Amino acid sequence: MLPTLYTCLLWLSTSGLWTVQAKGSDTDMSTRNPHRDLAPNNVDFAFTLYKHLVASAPGKNVFISPVSISTALAMLSLGARGYTREQLLQGLGFNLTEMSEGEIHRAFRHLHHLLRESNTTLDMTMGNALFLDHSLELLESFSADTKHYYELEALTTDFQDWAGASRQINEYIKNKTQGNIVDLFSESDSSATLILVNYIFFKGMWAHSFDLESTREENFHVNEATTVQVPMMFQSNTIKYLNDSVLPCQLVQLDYTGNETVFFVLPVKGKMDSVITALSRDTIQRWSKSLTMSQVDLYIPKISISGAYDLGGIMGDMGIADLLSNRTHFSGITQEALPKVSKVVHKAALQVDEKGLEADAPTRVSLSAAPGPLTLRFNRPFIIMIFDDFTWSSLFLGKVVNPT
């Protein structure tokens, strides 16, 4: 039987996204905060993975949590040996001559601590669990290292009884995500002997809420042939806005309460691919510096999307070619030999609605001599990106083709 790796089982709910904005010197912050050493690699990995997934799913919604995938693969490397371990870490963008394996895992540990503990105004749960067949026994070194660096919870189950095992795993995920991910596993998977789960539950509140009474049904143009009705949210406020002179798009940056911020990016009609191709650390930094406070009448649809991806083929394209092959070497996980990983599955979901910390409608300021607010209506496919601006982490990336 082959071990199955299910990574990054997520639920993101309500209203806010996150930005990569440096505060002070990169060198000084990196020296004092090991999580900052991860930021460049994690962001580069995030956009590379995102572009691969978008290219593999033309005309479809895409939504992922890159930091969760990075976490799962880094954690898996603790059980890998030889070239398999080297390939995993290099595939995540790490140069082992510049950053040791110990430094990588210590930085992930620090990052997860900050993401969990620094956002006291948000409802966020992060964690890692490993379900293994009762016939297997974890190596003491793997158990100790994964618990120390990733707070991994190891649980045994009977994979010969898949119905019972799936109920156990589903109940665990349901409880950890406050009931928002249910019935995750349903189909029989008799090949599984080990399932690794990395989960995130996040529920945020907009720093400035949308006006609930102003939400109206409007057209959303999925493509030339398809138009759907969506509940379109509205707020009129002074917000960060940019009409990009380099890329064919407009964007706004909205904040959650806490450290999280969201980019909503609206490409010019027919130019989505051009904008996605250009997404990078440099692009985000340029946008962050170029955004200006502007009076905007903003229309964004309520969103309810989810994504499920088998990342095996994508990992191969990104330089982790041996992950699903017979050449893999995961002898550092259990006493018994595990021949290879059979699946790398990522699941995520997103809901965005009007709710914010402020119950009243945002204040609209207008002067008789000043020009009126500009109108920005997200009524065609757009990009959504969520960052944590304290850790510089790319938490969620999405392409919304159909918000329903």
Swiss-Prot record:
- In this chain's numbering, which residues are marked as the site (Conserved cysteine within steroid binding domain)? 249
The molecular function terms of the Gene Ontology recorded here are: serine-type endopeptidase inhibitor activity; steroid binding
Q: Any idea where this protein resides?
A: Secreted
Give the record's glycosylation annotations as residue positions: 95, 119, 175, 259, 326
Question: Signal peptide location in the record?
Answer: 1-22
Gene Ontology terms, cellular component aspect? extracellular space
Alphabetized UniProt keyword annotations: Glycoprotein, Lipid-binding, Secreted, Signal, Steroid-binding, Transport
Q: Does the keyword Transport apply?
A: yes
Q: How is it modified after translation?
A: Glycosylation in position Asn-259 is needed for steroid binding.
Chief place where the protein resides: secreted
Family annotation (CDD domains): serpinA6_CBG
* Coiled-coil annotated residue ranges, if any: none
The answer, when asked if Lipoprotein is one of the entry's keywords, is: no
Give me any GO biological process, just one: glucocorticoid metabolic process
Question: Which residues does cortisol bind?
Answer: 253, 285, 392
Write down the PANTHER family for this protein, in alphabetical order: CORTICOSTEROID-BINDING GLOBULIN (PTHR11461:SF34), SERINE PROTEASE INHIBITOR, SERPIN (PTHR11461)
Its annotated function is as follows:
Major transport protein for glucocorticoids and progestins in the blood of almost all vertebrate species.
Q: Which family does it belong to?
A: Belongs to the serpin family.
Domain remarks in the Swiss-Prot or TrEMBL record: Proteolytic cleavage leads to an important conformation change. This reduces the affinity for steroids.
Task: Specify the protein name.
Answer: Corticosteroid-binding globulin
According to its UniProt entry, this protein's organism is: Bos taurus (Bovine)
**Gene that encodes it:** SERPINA6
